[in-house]
């Protein structure tokens, strides 16, 4: 990511929206809004549907050693609002 894009994109790790994770394990949104075990593929697809221009990076979440991958998305509103939107879109995709 170049310096001129700094501040215009946010990082989304699956743990941020995972209802199976506690707040101390990295969940950022409320349990009621989170989804169980979101995959990188689902996050990318949901972000595409929302027009957030996702970009995959093979980095692991510092708090958790298992699982690799994070997604950078356009910051079109606040971080928590975007995370809730992505989780909601994943819920819709799962039916």
UniProtKB/Swiss-Prot annotation:
An annotated GO BP: SRP-dependent cotranslational protein targeting to membrane, signal sequence recognition
Gene3D superfamilies: Signal recognition particle, SRP19-like subunit
InterPro entries, A to Z: Signal_recog_particle_SRP19, SRP19-like_sf, SRP19_arc-type
GO molecular function: 7S RNA binding
A Pfam family reported for this protein in Swiss-Prot or TrEMBL: SRP19
Annotated compartments: Cytoplasm
The keyword Cytoplasm is annotated on this UniProt entry: yes
Keywords: Cytoplasm, Ribonucleoprotein, RNA-binding, Signal recognition particle
A GO cellular-component term linked to this record: signal recognition particle
Family: Belongs to the SRP19 family.
Subunit structure and binding partners: Part of the signal recognition particle protein translocation system, which is composed of SRP and FtsY. Archaeal SRP consists of a 7S RNA molecule of 300 nucleotides and two protein subunits: SRP54 and SRP19.
NCBIfam families linked to this entry: PRK00754.1
The protein's role, per its UniProt record: Involved in targeting and insertion of nascent membrane proteins into the cytoplasmic membrane. Binds directly to 7S RNA and mediates binding of the 54 kDa subunit of the SRP.
Annotated protein name in UniProt: Signal recognition particle 19 kDa protein
Organism: Desulfurococcus amylolyticus (strain DSM 18924 / JCM 16383 / VKM B-2413 / 1221n) (Desulfurococcus kamchatkensis)
Gene name of the encoded protein: srp19
